[in-house]
Amino acid sequence: MIFDKLILNHNVWEKLSSAVNNNKVPNAFIFSGIDGTGKEAHAIEFSAFLNCKRVVEKKYPCGDCRSCLKVRSLNHEEIYLIHPTPPPKNKSDSNLDQKVIEEIYKNYKQKLLNPYHKIKIGNSKTIPIASIRGLKKKLFFSKSDENWSVVIISDAEKLCTQ
């Protein structure tokens, strides 16, 4: 397991692991529910399971292989976390301000310590279109035959067109 403190929803996890074991993984999942239930952590845990090289009991990521260690640090090259951020200062540029990047890293560290931590960057209320455009480029150029590409969009209702 990636998150030691995550209390798995076993009904949901059985369905997810069954889909993987039966080679019937759909192209998208929606993890919905009230805040504080671990939706985002379950999605991260599932992304680790998809990419794990030594799955335990056909149900859980090992937490120790190279892929799991990358997920454990929220630094896997095929797993993308998208969440509300301030828009870039230049609309044609998808790069974030250094202060925003530092705040993201601080939130990621808190997430690793507490899987129920809500990633919140300042008073961001939207997911800028520049984030999605940047993601599309990364996905287009980074496809690997060995790993699953996973995009986790937190607060997807906050996607915007500007």
Describe the role of every protein-language-model region.
Residues 2-159:
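Clamp-loader machinery-focused feature within the broader ASCE/P-loop NTPase space
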